[in-house]
Amino acid sequence: MKHHNYYPSTCLSILPFLLPLTMSHPQQNLLATTTSNTKAGNPVFPGWYADPEARLFNAQYWIYPTYSADYSEQTFFDAFSSPDLLTWTKHPTILNITNIPWSTNRAAWAPSVGRRLRSSANAEEEYDYFLYFSVGDGTGIGVAKSTTGKPEGPYEDVLGEPLVNGTVYGAEAIDAQIFQDDDGRNWLYFGGWSHAVVVELGEDMISLKGDYLEITPEGYVEGPWMLKRNGIYYYMFSVGGWGDNSYGVSYVTADSPTGPFSSTPKKILQGNDAVGTSTGHNSVFTPDGQDYYIVYHRRYVNDTARDHRVTCIDRMYFNEAGEILPVNITLEGVEGRTLS
């Protein structure tokens, strides 16, 4: 959660990125900070962006982040797509919250995107895409729908009011994540103020089904992410203070998406003074069900400006017991990889 901003001239003066297209183009092709012929480098694209959610849609990698800026400047969401983890295309302003009357026109945080098949065909036009977002520093969590049937939108608010309104079990209505289980059920995880909540989504993906459940694990602060692997549910979340190097990621496990969860969290992501600090608010993707990648934000070493957060990708590994191993954060990033 929290702020982000992107100043093209400033970022280009301090980061070794190339922008082949002009800034006025509706989509901007970006190169990651490539450190070799095969590795992307971290951060993966320019600009102050945090809370990155990774998705795999239509043989492309997608990242939906928060724009890291003052609350008053956070009035939109950008998205980024890549065929290979090396070259990224920026899709500006996929949702403008100033067009949403209930939004308060500030503090647009932590988007999460899911999709629903319209028919049995697998063409991209056969999907409806839904974007869950929080605005107004806890005003509520809304849901928007792609008007084009594509993951880049643009998206428009579909309810005219929040899907989740106000505080639930002490949880601020921020940092939504849609988790689409392999049994066809959809779950919405969310929560700030050190409380975590989950609720099932209706089949239409724009309504709630059933009751809210509080699932707060020890140390939870914000930024939930649910991952399922080999029948085990890994509930990942941010711990510590997002403004300093106590920020990190821990996880607990369960046999169901609503718990009960293991009682002792394990911390697997932590910044350091050699690579980057304030590492947190993660997501995870796997291209093949075997190799796993963690996407997260961090700050440059010795940069304490609260909104100077950048998006990074590193590998994530499991041991034979199914435990997530501590992540080695890097400057070189991950190797390029296409999706079949």
Curated annotation (Swiss-Prot):
Name the domain of life.
Eukaryota
Q: Which residues form the signal peptide?
A: 1-24
Gene3D superfamilies listed in its UniProt record: Glycosyl hydrolase domain, family 43 (2.115.10.20)
Q: How is it used?
A: Beta-D-galactofuranosidases are being responsible for the degradation of beta-galactofuranoside (Galf)-containing glycans which are important as drug targets and immunogenic motifs in the production of pharmaceuticals due to the absence of the Galf monosaccharide in mammalian tissues.
Q: How does activity depend on pH?
A: Optimum pH is 5.0.
Q: Which InterPro entries match?
A: Glyco_hydro_43 (IPR006710), Glyco_hydro_beta-prop_sf (IPR023296), Glycosyl_Hydrlase_43_Enz (IPR052176)
Q: Which residues form the active site?
A: 51, 222
Sorted keywords for this record are: Carbohydrate metabolism, Glycoprotein, Glycosidase, Hydrolase, Secreted, Signal
Provide a GO CC annotation, any one: extracellular region
Q: How does activity depend on temperature?
A: Optimum temperature is 25 degrees Celsius.
Q: Which residues are reported to be glycosylated? A: 96, 165, 302, 328
Known pathway: Glycan degradation
Q: Name one GO biological process term.
A: carbohydrate metabolic process
Location in the cell reads: Secreted
Q: Which GO terms describe its molecular function?
A: endo-1,4-beta-xylanase activity
Instruction: Give the similarity note.
Output: Belongs to the glycosyl hydrolase 43 family.
What function does the entry list?
Glycoside hydrolase family 43 beta-D-galactofuranosidase involved in the degradation of beta-galactofuranoside (Galf)-containing glycans such as galactomannan or O-glycans. Is not active on beta-1,5- or beta-1,6-linked beta-D-galactofuranose (Galf) residues.
Q: What is this protein called?
A: Beta-D-galactofuranosidase xynD
Which organism does this record belong to?
A: Aspergillus niger (strain ATCC MYA-4892 / CBS 513.88 / FGSC A1513)
Q: Which gene encodes it?
A: xynD
